Amino acid sequence: MALPFADDSVDICLSSNVAEHVPRPWQLGGEMLRVTKPGGLAVLSYTVWLGPFGGHEMGLTHYLGGARAAARYARKHGHPAKNNYGSSLFAVSAADGLSWAASTGAAVAAFPRYHPRWAWWLTSVPVLREFLVSNLVLVLRPR
């Protein structure tokens, strides 16, 4: 999952709605930090698994479990979902993203994408954030 860029080579690195589609999202985040110049910005935004859109086209059935939701989708529609749980869609939590960002020492901000600013406090409440933050934005500034 190495990005094809040299270390410290870009001013801004953005990943929007990709992390939930790779098996190792924090490796992706690490690569983003590697290629971002010190003082630059890395922005990683992803759909939170337990949020209302975590199952993507499977809708809220992902609350039944990823494999079960995928099987139900295939039965109902006669073909597998485009985002196949376990191979092209993975359960990524808000807690894991916040923990990873904090561990880098580069975290600047974390907030829920698509929410008004007054609702940004939701990211600070464990459990609640997993269900009410549909998409988490992590902003990092490498040193």
Label the model's feature ranges:
Residues 17-21:
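A short His-aromatic
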Residues 2-7:
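Short conserved loop adjoining the S-adenosyl-L-methionine
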Residues 23-31, 37, 41-141:
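S-adenosyl-L-methionine-dependent methyltransferase catalytic module, highlighting the catalytic core
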Residues 14:
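A conserved beta-strand element that flanks and buttresses the S-adenosyl-L-methionine
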